[in-house]
Amino acid sequence: MKLGGIDEAGRGPVVGPLVIAAVVIDESKIEKFEALGVKDSKKLSPKKREELFEKIIELVDDYFILELSPEDIDKREGTMNDFEVENFAKVLNSLKIKPDLVYIDAADVNEERFGIVVREKLSFYPKIIAEHKADSKYIPVAAASILAKVTRDKAIERLKEIYGNIGSGYPSDPITRKFLEEYYKEHGSFPPVVRRSWKTLKKIEEKLQKEKNQSNLLNFLKKS
């Protein structure tokens, strides 16, 4: 039996791409992946993920990786869940070898619903198991999570070569917020690598505008 796994990396960040990866693994190879130490990418060091990336590529029967830019995300119609459903299906349909069973790391609060709507968009008819934290339960999803995470990490490293230290790209990262604020102060706009539909940017704009207004008021009072 051919087992499929699909996962994403970079759903929440304000900077950089969303990466979706899928793999197909023959059931007979699962033990080889376990022996390699393949597990949820979040539980592995960056170095270990990179080592496993190449080994996974060699061992899987098939794989497909889709990198979606901030522009792709901003142009979406509907919610992020709708966007992920559409692109999860796109990635699975792009596999040359179709799995008989697909494990999905569900992005919806309703796991079953997420699996159903993905299945409706597939060009083939596998059994679907959609669950939260599937990357920590099923080897095919763990392998896909590593491919997605390493691909996104490499994209972030390329951005750091251009823009300097941008942090992890997550809105909660102080380094990322500092980068966005300083870039906006210098250029009057945000860089092309950010998701303009994220509320984070509006909050930063409002904060900087407030600071500017306060500064202008202080200067006015000093002169008067």
Curated annotation (Swiss-Prot):
It catalyses: Endonucleolytic cleavage to 5'-phosphomonoester. It is an enzyme of class 3 (hydrolase). The keyword Nuclease applies. Manganese or magnesium. Binds 1 divalent metal ion per monomer in the absence of substrate. May bind a second metal ion after substrate binding. SUPFAM superfamilies: Ribonuclease H-like. Residues 1-210 form the RNase H type-2 domain. CDD domains: RNase_HII_archaea_like. GO terms for cellular component: cytoplasm; ribonuclease H2 complex. A divalent metal cation binds at residues 7-8, 105. Keywords: Cytoplasm, Endonuclease, Hydrolase, Manganese, Metal-binding, Nuclease. Its main location: cytoplasm. Endonuclease that specifically degrades the RNA of RNA-DNA hybrids. This is Ribonuclease HII.
